[in-house]
A protein has these predicted regions:
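Cap/lid segment of the alpha/beta-hydrolase catalytic domain
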Residues: 113-178
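Phosphate/oxyanion-binding active-site loops and adjacent basic polyanion-contact surfaces
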Residues: 31, 59-65, 94-95, 159-179, ...
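Catalytic-loop region of hydrolases
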Residues: 1-100
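Structural recognition of the beta-strand scaffold that forms the well-ordered cores
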Residues: 36-38, 81-85, 112-117, 199-202, ...
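Short amphipathic alpha-helix adjacent to the substrate-entry channel of hydrolases
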Residues: 96-114
């Protein structure tokens, strides 16, 4: 559950990591870029069967994450398309690869872009970039005394993991963000825009996240809510998950 969004102010000294405004002058192209802290709670899941089913392992763990929104300055010029990107974390820093590849079309068509931090291994680099701006980000592990599984250790999956944080918080973050963007709550940062379709995208490791979300979460009744949490999915360079 997302409890609150808080816009992060931009100054000459403090601005978003990999800011498109700074490097592409989005404001001169009729777009605005805003960054938000996203506060909430999320469940942590574990595998329930060999077909990708999951069940809750730990409920309601608190987190502080961040999103970045790029949208037309003029709400009337919005296409109604909202593209949510699972920002790629593979290099231990944030790379919004699908934005990099598609921004010209997004801006030309009037699409809204929303990028979400997808893995806490990137927080250290963001804090190094601007500690005051990003120091409050937290994906704290709600069960730090539980060791990593033997399977994870054997398969070599510990390279960018540690007991201080919990990567599994992401799935509920993504679901709750999608429904927030669809709704008309006051805290929805794009509530003034037309929103007809909400899409999910990601590149490489983030594409694999997309596959996992689609296979294990998107069609769970509490996620789909009798409809579709996302209207479409586009993975770039992903592998099966």
């Amino acid at each position: 559950m997302i409890t609150r969004l808080e816009e992060i102010s931009v100054t000459k000294e403090s601005y978003p990591f990999a800011s498109a405004e700074r490097y592409l002058k989005l404001s001169e192209r009729g777009y605005v870029e805003k960054e938000y802290y996203m506060y909430g709670t999320a469940n942590v899941y574990e595998t329930a069967d060999e077909r990708g089913g999951v069940r809750v392992r730990t409920a309601d763990a608190p987190y502080t994450n961040r999103i970045i929104v790029r949208a037309p300055q003029d709400t009337a010029k919005c296409s109604g398309n909202v593209v949510v990107e699972i920002i790629n974390p593979t290099s231990f820093m944030e790379i919004d690869r699908m934005w990099i590849l598609g921004w010209k079309k997004f801006v030309r068509d009037g699409d809204i872009y929303v990028g979400i931090t997808s893995k806490p291994n990137t927080i250290a680099k963001m804090v190094e970039f601007d500690e005051k701006r990003y120091g409050r980000l937290s994906w704290a592990n709600p069960t730090p005394d539980v060791p990593f599984s033997e399977r994870l250790q054997v398969t070599g999956g510990l390279g960018d993991l540690n007991h201080d944080y919990e990567t599994g918080l992401f799935w509920d973050m993504l679901t709750d963000l999608a429904w927030l963007l669809r709704g008309d709550e006051e805290q929805n940062p794009i509530r003034e825009y037309k929103r007809e379709y909400v899409y999910l995208t990601g590149w490489s490791q983030s594409g694999s996240y997309l596959f996992r979300y689609l296979n294990s979460f998107a069609y769970r009744p509490e996620v789909a809510r009798g409809a579709c949490v996302f209207d479409g999915y586009l993975s770039g360079g992903g592998v099966h998950s």
